[in-house]
């Protein structure tokens, strides 16, 4: 199985805090770390650990972080030949605060991620054509996302699009994805709605009406909503005590993509994705928390979760 991830590569600068600061407040932090991240890189590492032959198309800076990021991806089993360094450009950086409950706030400076162009994607057309699925996110320029989706459609490769972080205005290309995987805030943003103004099921229905083949909406502790032309089903979450939720959605998306390629029923695929996301919450850091296929299988074997309508 071949997965091509087209997306961001960041260095995460992470600190723990008791609570998130409000405007004008100083808070004490501790356990400061630099950890490889970026939604694209996280999803590539997750897919590789879950057993897929995974290639990442992305850009890093010609700085110390760029070298570390590429080496870390290679060590995780990701094929890095399509990752290039942009001269004179810094690598992308994410500043992450994690509170006592394991919840996070993130500020991203895109750096070289903003230099991944439609021309770069066109040059990677052979990689798109030979992939079993292309996985994308929105931490790279919207025109680059649109180009990747368009080429994938031309060559018949399915696309799984993680709609984070949300962008305005919304590029209509995301609605042509084979599977669209937003969380609730991202779903609302895609529809031009205020966060919390619609329930998860309604958001999934409304997104499906915009054109994607299916919607798998990530609803955190309330599981996932799967919507396609035949049904709408809620897939319950697994109850855990999170340490760090930073890359749970990335683990979810990678696992979902792999199960989709295998031909697994989408609701069953979402259950496996929920398990991968839950496991990713049990360790600090993005890429270090990505589970292996064996860990997901073991976790599922110890659970009793069923589908509910």
Regions found by a protein language model. Give the residues of each.
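Conserved phosphate-binding/catalytic loop of the ribokinase/pfkB sugar-kinase fold
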Residues: 59, 82-86, 96-133, 138
């Amino acid at each position: 199985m071949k997965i091509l991830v087209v997306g961001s590569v960041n260095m995460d600068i992470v600190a723990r805090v008791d609570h998130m600061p409000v405007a004008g407040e100083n808070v004490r932090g501790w356990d400061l770390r630099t950890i490889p991240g970026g939604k694209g890189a996280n999803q590539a590492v997750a897919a590789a650990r879950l057993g897929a032959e995974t290639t990442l198309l992305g850009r890093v800076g010609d700085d110390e972080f760029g070298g570390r990021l590429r080496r870390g991806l290679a060590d995780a089993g990701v094929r890095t030949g399509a990752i290039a360094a942009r001269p004179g450009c810094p690598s992308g950086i994410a500043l992450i605060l994690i509170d006592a409950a394991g919840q996070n706030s993130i500020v991203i400076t895109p750096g070289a991620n903003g230099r991944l162009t439609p021309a770069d994607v066109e040059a990677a057309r052979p990689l798109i054509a030979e992939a079993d699925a292309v996985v994308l996110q929105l931490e790279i320029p919207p025109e680059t996302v649109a180009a990747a989706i368009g080429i994938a459609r031309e060559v018949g490769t399915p696309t799984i699009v993680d709609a984070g972080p949300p962008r305005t205005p919304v590029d209509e290309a995301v609605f042509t994805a084979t599977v669209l995987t937003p969380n609730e805030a991202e779903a609302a943003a895609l529809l031009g709605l205020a966060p919390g103004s619609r329930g998860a099921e309604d958001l999934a229905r409304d997104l499906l009406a915009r054109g994607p083949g299916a919607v798998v909406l990530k609803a955190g502790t309330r599981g996932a909503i799967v919507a396609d032309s035949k049904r709408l089903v809620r897939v319950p979450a697994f109850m855990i005590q999170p340490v760090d939720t930073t890359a749970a959605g990335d683990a979810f998306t990678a696992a979902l993509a792999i199960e989709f390629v295998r031909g697994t029923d989408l609701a069953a695929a979402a259950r496996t994705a929920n398990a991968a996301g839950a496991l990713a919450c049990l360790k600090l850091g993005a890429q270090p928390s990505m589970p292996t296929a064996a860990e997901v299988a073991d976790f599922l074997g110890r659970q009793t979760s069923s589908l509910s309508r």
